[in-house]
Amino acid sequence: MSKTKDQRTAKTLERTWDTLNHLLFISSCLYKLNLKSIAQITLSILAMIISTSLIIAAIIFIASANHKVTLTTAIIQDATSQIKNTTPTYLTQNPQLGISFSNLSETTSQPATTPALTTPSAESTPQSTTVKTKNTTTTQIQPSKPTTKQHQNKPPNKPNNHFHFEVFNFVPCSICSNNPTCWAICKRIPNKKPGKKTTTKPTKKPTIKTTKKDLKPQTTKPKEVLTTKPTEKPTINTTKTNIRTTLLTTNTTGNPEYTSQKETLHSTSPEGNPSPSQVYTTSEYPSQPPSPSNTTD
């Protein structure tokens, strides 16, 4: 009955929420139109009433939801308390070793009730307690232990295996203190790195040697340029002497009288070789005409 009431209240709240939203939309559209002042005032009042009703409906909806949450939490607490009461704390015994661990509250309460009911003798009490403990341990422990171990051990093993394969491949050797697995993986990582370095080293060396060989022929080329320069200088001097000889020949061929004077000048020199001053005078005079006084003498 309580569930049906909650469902009805929820449906009524949803319907009121939708109708109020539609009324707000319609009132806002009418307010935008150029109506009379009285109509605008009434629409604004309706909008205020609708907005307040929406707020009230939201509060009611939240309150009902909180009430449902409190009911569910109370039901869960009752269920957990019932489970704890129905499942007593039993003895956990290893059948191979015969070791038993139990809560002290139950072990003390059980032997206290047995001697009062059966006999006042002290010898019969320990036998009855031991029989009860053995019966309880054998019936309750064996079906419960394998179920808990099988469910707990299987799922954590899988992520641990993936974790070891993914992470320990990148562990440096400085972290490994005494773990043999860590040292085994750590030795594999540096073995791969120096192999790559050895392949890169020989490729760089021949490139340096080729650059040194290319620089040697460049030093020999400027030496050849220096040897060609002194050969050009005597050619310039020979051209100058040829120009002087051509001037002398042109001057002497034009005037036959100066040839005889030139011969006399050469003959006057004691050594037979003309002096530079005499040769220079003869080269200057060809442009001037001969005087008549020199010819008559």
From Swiss-Prot:
- Give the compositionally biased regions (Pro residues): 287-297
Q: Which sites does the entry annotate for glycosylation?
A: 70, 72, 80, 86-87, 92, 100, 103, 105, 113, 119, 135, 137-139, 144, 147, 199, 203, 219, 231, 235, 237, 251, 253, 269, 275, 282-283, 287, 294
Polar residues bias located where? 254-286
Q: Which residues lie on this side of the membrane: Cytoplasmic?
A: 1-37
Residue numbers spanned by region Binding to host heparan sulfate: 187-198
Q: Which residues cross the membrane?
A: 38-66
Disordered: annotated span: 105-160, 190-297
Topology, Extracellular side: 67-297
- Keyword Ribonucleoprotein attributed: no
In this chain, the site described as Cleavage is at 65-66
**Ranges of Basic residues compositional bias?**
190-207
Q: Where is the composition biased (Basic and acidic residues)?
A: 211-232
What ranges does the record list as Low complexity composition bias?
107-139, 149-160, 233-253
Q: Which UniProt keywords apply?
A: Disulfide bond, Glycoprotein, Host cell membrane, Host membrane, Host-virus interaction, Membrane, Secreted, Transmembrane, Transmembrane helix, Viral attachment to host cell, Viral immunoevasion, Virion, Virus entry into host cell
Q: Which domain of life is it from?
A: Viruses
- Cystine links in this protein are 173-186, 176-182
Is the keyword Membrane assigned to this protein? Answer: yes
UniProt GO cellular component terms? extracellular region; host cell plasma membrane; membrane; virion membrane
What GO biological process terms does the UniProt entry carry, in alphabetical order? symbiont entry into host cell; virion attachment to host cell
Q: Which residues form the signal peptide?
A: none
Q: Which family does it belong to?
A: Belongs to the pneumoviruses glycoprotein G family.
Under which name does UniProt file this protein? Answer: Major surface glycoprotein G
- Which organism does this sequence originate in? Human respiratory syncytial virus A (strain rsb6614)
* Name of the gene encoding the protein in the UniProt record: G
